[in-house]
Regions:
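Catalytic-domain carbohydrate-binding cleft regions of carbohydrate-active enzymes
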Residues: 1-193
Length: 193
């Protein structure tokens, strides 16, 4: 019942809905902890939400939604690269939001990296809104599984890269490493990075 109330408003975000797949509600993923495991689970969770009928999905907050993780931070043990990587991943998702003010916890250099990716997300805004309108008409998720978009091309178990709408293949580095392999579907692809 509570989630149905959200249908009365043009803007909404829910973290836990039951039997609301297919409705015009933004479904935010459940809280992830501040850890690399939390970052690794972002893409598979977004893909799963879309396949379950939640066309409008929002990842958990950048760096994880457990605010307690950011209280009394020991800067010597705090891994700023996790926040930066999380921000980079979120920049190519339908929505992005910080769990803690980045200027409170990041060095000037890492803050500038996050600012760059927030601006990228802003630049993607018109495209993301176009995809939201498309989702309203078709029910297709904005974040789409590779196998959904390219059936029969061997993407059945691919859960670490996705299509943002039908135009952008997104393959983020989701661990503390600096590179990854990307599996491309048939056709011609352009690296816009």
């Amino acid at each position: 019942l509570w989630a149905k109330l959200g249908l009365l408003f043009p803007y909404n975000e829910f973290r836990a809905c039951w039997k609301m797949g297919g409705e015009a509600l933004v479904q935010r993923l459940g809280d992830k902890e501040y850890s690399w495991d939390g970052v690794v689970r972002l893409v598979p969770s977004m893909i799963a939400a879309g396949l379950l009928g939640h066309a409008y999905t929002c990842p958990d907050m950048i760096g994880g939604g457990q605010f307690g993780s950011f209280l009394n931070i020991d800067q010597d043990k705090f891994d700023q690269s996790l926040i930066v990587r999380s921000c980079q991943i979120h920049s190519m998702m339908p929505m992005m939001q910080f769990s803690v003010a980045p200027w409170r916890i990041l060095s000037p250099e890492n803050l500038e990296i996050c600012r760059t990716y927030a601006l990228l997300h802003e630049q993607m805004g018109d495209y993301i809104l176009e995809q939201a309108r498309h989702s309203a008409q078709t029910g297709e998720p904005i974040v789409r599984a590779m196998d959904y978009m390219f059936p029969g091309e061997g993407f059945e178990e691919c859960n670490d890269q996705y299509m943002l709408g039908d135009k952008y293949l997104v393959a983020p580095v989701t661990d503390s490493g600096v590179s990854r392999s990307v599996k491309l579907p048939k056709g011609k692809w352009v690296d816009e990075n």
